[in-house]
Amino acid sequence: MSSTHVVQHLLAASALTVAFAATAAAADPFMLTSTTFKDGQMMPRKVANTNPQNPNCVGENVSPQLSWSNAPEGTKSFALLMEDPEGRGGAGVHHWVAYGIPASVTSFAEGEVSKPSEKYIGGKSTQGVGNYSGPCTPPGTPHHYTFVVVATDLDPKELAPGLTREEFLAKLVPPAPAMSHSKGTAGLVGLFVKPN
């Protein structure tokens, strides 16, 4: 999959940047970064999932370190979404859905969200869990894992746990004429494939 197609899929499938309210103007852009991997580069093996029943799960399920900065004005909470748009034959796999992250929280340490935490409300991933669930990429071409942080004007405790990605997005963008609760988004992409 070309990098152009990945970016287009991320924007279209996530419906975050285009469909939500424009990011509030700021001197510095809203940013998402990681010390575990560089944007557009391979992620280390340890971030892959561990499942003895799936030979493609070859890691330790250690969540990557994530930091975000320069949140838009009016932000009350954050959400983090992780998706593999190439997973399940192009149908996509939602590896992590987390929301209700207080505005005072601007990072997660490496491994911190591999388990439930009081710092976020766990949604429901494709795997049916609320915490980070790492890649189980088959051999061949690396998959592009998209990480998106969403700044919202929602109170951190406003949403119930267990929302799927689609349910969360529906809460974020209610039917017109109601305004979107998104204040802006930032993202990065990590690559992974099962080593030979």
State where each predicted segment sits.
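Bacterial N-terminal signal peptides
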Residues: L10-A21
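Bacterial N-terminal signal peptides that target proteins for export
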Residues: M1-A12
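N-terminus-centered regions that define maturation/targeting leaders and the start
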Residues: A25-N196
